[in-house]
């Protein structure tokens, strides 16, 4: 498995945006099911240039889905990684550059 095949895509939902905006920042990715935490950490560092503090993983097991036939189908097995980066570090996972925070100096 190559280092570029580890991180498949970021997971962007309301829940993950809430986690992303807190300190320390945590980013959620769909990863290759065969990747371990060390591979995930190396891939994140190679792609984004930031060494993660921690990597937590969870496996979403296949669930039964309705197919409209007698035989049930199953969803795919997915592995999800929650990657924690150091304080003050911001990563642009959507392709946009992070905007610098502006302090409001206009007090009345």
UniProtKB/Swiss-Prot annotation:
InterPro entries per UniProt: Nucleotide-bd_a/b_plait_sf, Ribosomal_uL23-like, Ribosomal_uL23/eL15/eS24_sf
Pfam families: Ribosomal_L23
Cellular component, GO annotation: ribonucleoprotein complex; ribosome
Keyword annotations of the record: Ribonucleoprotein, Ribosomal protein, RNA-binding, rRNA-binding
GO BP term, example: translation
GO molecular-function terms, A-Z: rRNA binding; structural constituent of ribosome
Family annotation (SUPFAM superfamilies): Ribosomal proteins S24e, L23 and L15e
Function field: One of the early assembly proteins it binds 23S rRNA. One of the proteins that surrounds the polypeptide exit tunnel on the outside of the ribosome. Forms the main docking site for trigger factor binding to the ribosome.
Subunit structure: Part of the 50S ribosomal subunit. Contacts protein L29, and trigger factor when it is bound to the ribosome.
Family membership noted in the UniProt record: Belongs to the universal ribosomal protein uL23 family.
NCBIfam families cross-referenced by the UniProt entry: PRK05738.3-3
Protein name as it appears in the record: Large ribosomal subunit protein uL23
């Amino acid at each position: 498995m190559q280092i570029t095949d580890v991180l498949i895509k970021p997971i962007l939902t309301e829940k993950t945006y809430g986690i992303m905006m807190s300190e320390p920042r945590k980013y959620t990715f769909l990863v290759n099911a065969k990747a371990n935490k060390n591979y995930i950490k190396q891939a994140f560092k190679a792609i984004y240039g930031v060494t993660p503090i921690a990597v937590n993983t969870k496996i979403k097991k296949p669930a039964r889905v309705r197919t409209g036939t007698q035989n049930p189908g199953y969803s795919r097995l997915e592995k999800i990684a929650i990657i924690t980066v150091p304080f003050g570090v911001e990563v642009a996972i959507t392709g946009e550059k992070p905007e610098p925070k502006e302090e409001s100096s206009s007090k009345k």
